Amino acid sequence: MLPQGLIVSCQALPDEPLHSSFIMSKMALAAYEGGAVGIRANSKADIIEIKKEVDLPVIGIVKRDYAHSDVFITATSKEIDELIESNCEVIALDATKQTRPKESLSELVSYIRNKAPNVEIMADISTLEEAKNADELGFDYVGTTLRGYTSYTKGHILYENNYQFLKDVLAHVNAKVIAEGNVITPEMFKDVTDLGVHCTVVGGAITRPKEITKRFINAFDK
């Protein structure tokens, strides 16, 4: 089980300056030394390097684009196989209602349970309906990761209306809830923790210096 507290997402995509499994492993080490209780990471290669560097549970994902589908976070059994080989403790996958490229969500849950019964599963959702569905499918964790990132939730952010969406998810699912997405300040981390989430994933605000720099620069463009 993931411990309660702060999980730091250490990811860099191919077009980003820090794209390197070695660099991500050092980013994870810095997060560990700062007090993180877990890491979220993208790709088998990154996870293997991170696990050499820190003794923390890892939420693993594989981001891969597929034609005719907007699902790109651990979209098929191919990505799940890679994550099982990485020995990550938790596999996270897109649990939205978007059209999937191959297997159904329920088929993927069964696939993980059968192939890796000791691995926990996290649902990345964007709506309350998706959270409830993930809960019914038996996910161990439900995360608000994709709120604002699906076509039908675009424009929404986690902290709008005093975190009402997060409050609704907490009230309607039995799975442990993970706050993720647009948690960009220590105060927000405290806010969502006080609401009762099991843990919180923070990425861009900690591990993406290019984006952090842009936020400072953009302050002058408004």
Swiss-Prot record:
Its EC number is 5.1.3.9. Pathway: Amino-sugar metabolism; N-acetylneuraminate degradation; D-fructose 6-phosphate from N-acetylneuraminate: step 3/5. Signal peptide: none annotated. One of its GO terms (cellular component) is cytosol. It comes from the Bacteria. The keyword Isomerase applies. The keyword Isomerase applies. It catalyses: an N-acyl-D-glucosamine 6-phosphate = an N-acyl-D-mannosamine 6-phosphate. One of its GO terms (biological process) is N-acetylmannosamine catabolic process. InterPro entries: Aldolase_TIM, NanE, RibuloseP-bd_barrel. Keywords: Carbohydrate metabolism, Isomerase. CDD domains: NanE. One of its GO terms (molecular function) is N-acylglucosamine-6-phosphate 2-epimerase activity. NCBIfam families: PRK01130.1 (NF002231). Belongs to the NanE family. PANTHER family: N-ACETYLMANNOSAMINE-6-PHOSPHATE 2-EPIMERASE-RELATED. Converts N-acetylmannosamine-6-phosphate (ManNAc-6-P) to N-acetylglucosamine-6-phosphate (GlcNAc-6-P). This is Putative N-acetylmannosamine-6-phosphate 2-epimerase. It comes from Staphylococcus saprophyticus subsp. saprophyticus (strain ATCC 15305 / DSM 20229 / NCIMB 8711 / NCTC 7292 / S-41).
